[in-house]
């Protein structure tokens, strides 16, 4: 059921999360998570664009995307290993181990052509991130007038922000510091060009900055946390999906931000009750 008049495209990573403690594997990756959460959230259209490997775990991710009704018409399947990441859970918190740097995807540069760009323009925004190997295409998309949502990591360097944030419309990252340090970090990122900048801080909630004021959103606390995998992805997804819908309805921008932050907090809490990033687990053998 469509609840939000939003069209979203995830461009970049897909992986399989291998849970070593339970020998279950789950589909994941920042961009795949975005598409799955958007479907759960009730958007008009969700699509994934990226490279798959040619092995069994690639087929597993493809089958889940098909089951969810996520568009994959711009994907390519390359000969080689699909991306995977090993992890375990400790008291519901995810702990990452070994990973294969995206498999064949990490070795194959993206080059967007005019037809790709026309396709991307059909969506309200494209989402990608710093584990997606898409950085070389950010300028190309920006110059084509495409709005870009980008997930920086907590280990993104100052130089990385300075190089890529100027191409970004909506910037997201996680942050560990106190309120004052968080606000300074937000100001720094915003000064580089993005319209909106968001910091998520786990149980401390979120702080967002639009260049005029800060917005704070407490985390929605729940008792039955199962797995925090995808908590940040689900927050940014539901915020963006709701925010775009609110703007299309003519809602004042500041009110749209406040409404969307509340919705995002609730949705992210719900996602923490699921196994894996969004479920769809399958047993695997070493």
What does each of the following model-derived ranges do?
Residues 124-188, 204-205:
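Conserved beta-alpha-beta core of the PfkB/ribokinase-like small-molecule kinase fold
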Residues 43-44, 143-147, 192-196:
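A short helix->loop->beta-strand "cap" motif at the edges of active sites that frequently abuts
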Residues 16-21, 25, 44-124:
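Conserved N-terminal subdomain of the carbohydrate kinase-like
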Residues 31-40:
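Histidine-anchored nucleotide/phosphate-binding helix
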Residues 1-23:
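Positively charged, low-complexity intrinsically disordered leader regions
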Residues 31-32, 101-102, 152-157, 175-179, ...:
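Short, acidic/turn-prone active-site loops that include or flank metal/cofactor-
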